[in-house]
Amino acid sequence: MIIERARELAVRAPARVVFPDALDERVLKAAHYLQQYGLARPVLVASPFALRQFALSHRMAMDGIQVIDPHSNLSMRQRFAQRWLARAGEKTPPDAVEKLSDPLMFAAAMVSAGEADVCIAGNLSSTANVLRAGLRVIGLQPGCKTLSSIFLMLPQYAGPALGFADCSVVPQPTAAQLADIALASADTWRAITGEEPRVAMLSFSSNGSARHPNVANVQQATELVRERAPQLLVDGELQFDAAFVPEVAAQKAPDSPLQGRANVMIFPSLEAGNIGYKITQRLGGYRAVGPLIQGLAAPLHDLSRGCSVQEIIELALVAAVPRQADVSRERSLHTLVE
């Protein structure tokens, strides 16, 4: 349902999706598909000559797909550097114009300036480089202290869709960071799925069944979430089965408001989250879409370097949903006014 909803919104209001890791057969196939079916307006950031040679060597068409060369667009780089300076002040590097000749930095600047709706990277670049470009050029959302990520775990055969966080950014989150991750993930889930989040703060303990500093960290994070968002349905600490299986929840956490039906799982550490999503993906009959980066002031998202063409397409679609939902609401309001 999540991908179907994203496709419907994409057809109504195709987003401008920029790909900085463009010299990749998977990206060219994904961009061609998105363009062909009117699901997005892809932009490839690369040297046109290098991209043309790459496409020819792989016998691929690039008809109608926009290509922007950061090296030959000095005026754009100068304009982006001015925005960077206005936002970051003295933290802006003196060679900002030169740094923006890097495709990843340039693409981040495009979404920061509103000249693209979404940036999808990471198919060739490391997560560290993607996050560095986002933090340096885009910066954090006002009031945000913790950058994090969420995977959408989609069933291939049966079962509910789930959100898994944080699986790629914060190695050992504090209680305050876990609370930030939970709140950001709840917002992302609501924006992309249109459903109310039911958040489980995961641990190896359920309702105090074990005592350990790591358990206490999750318990403290849960209380912080409740204080900051009293309307949010959240519980913790819970083991995965107590969060996901109603029959187990009835035994281990009978008073839990989630009743074993959580849809957003907050892992206590990056180690647990990364292992958990890969096990779910490889053994559990689920496919992973993401990770969607949470906390940046503009949408920049990070693929796994082992991603497939389908995963690139799906991330491009779901990442654009919040913007497209806003466009649809604006059009509906405009129609009502008329």
Curated annotation (Swiss-Prot):
Function: Required for the use of ethanolamide (EA) as carbon, but not nitrogen, source. Involved in acetate metabolism during growth on EA, when expressed independently of the eut operon it can restore growth to a double pta-acs deletion mutant. Required for acetate excretion during growth on EA.
Record keyword Phosphoprotein present: no
Binding partners and assembly: Homodimer.
MF (Gene Ontology): phosphate acetyltransferase activity
Keyword Cell inner membrane listed: no
Pathway note: Amine and polyamine degradation; ethanolamine degradation
Pfam families listed in its UniProt record: PTA_PTB (PF01515)
Recorded superkingdom: Bacteria
EC number: 2.3.1.8
PANTHER family found in the cross-reference section: PHOSPHATE ACETYLTRANSFERASE, PHOSPHATE ACETYLTRANSFERASE EUTD
Signal peptide residue numbers: none
Localisation per UniProt entry: Bacterial microcompartment
Catalytic activity from the UniProt record: acetyl-CoA + phosphate = acetyl phosphate + CoA
Recorded effect of pH on activity: Optimum pH is 7.2.
Family assignment from sequence similarity: Belongs to the phosphate acetyltransferase and butyryltransferase family.
Gene disruption phenotype: Can use ethanolamine (EA) as a nitrogen source but not as a carbon source. Not required for aerobic growth on EA supplemented with cobalamin (vitamin B12); deletions and mutations in this gene probably have polar effects on downstream gene expression. A double eutD-eutM and a quadruple eutP-eutQ-eutT-eutD deletion are not required for growth in the above conditions. Somewhat reduced growth on EA, no excretion of acetate from cells. Reduced growth is due to residual nutrients from rich medium.
BP GO terms, sorted: ethanolamine catabolic process; generation of precursor metabolites and energy
Alphabetic keyword roster: Acyltransferase, Bacterial microcompartment, Transferase, Virulence
Lineage: Bacteria, Pseudomonadati, Pseudomonadota, Gammaproteobacteria, Enterobacterales
Gene3D superfamilies: 3.40.50.10950, Isocitrate/Isopropylmalate dehydrogenase-like
Protein name: Phosphate acetyltransferase EutD
Chief location bin: other
Entry's induction text: Part of the 17-gene eut operon transcribed from a single promoter, induced by ethanolamine and adenosylcobalamin (AdoCbl, vitamin B12).
Any single Gene Ontology cellular-component annotation: bacterial microcompartment
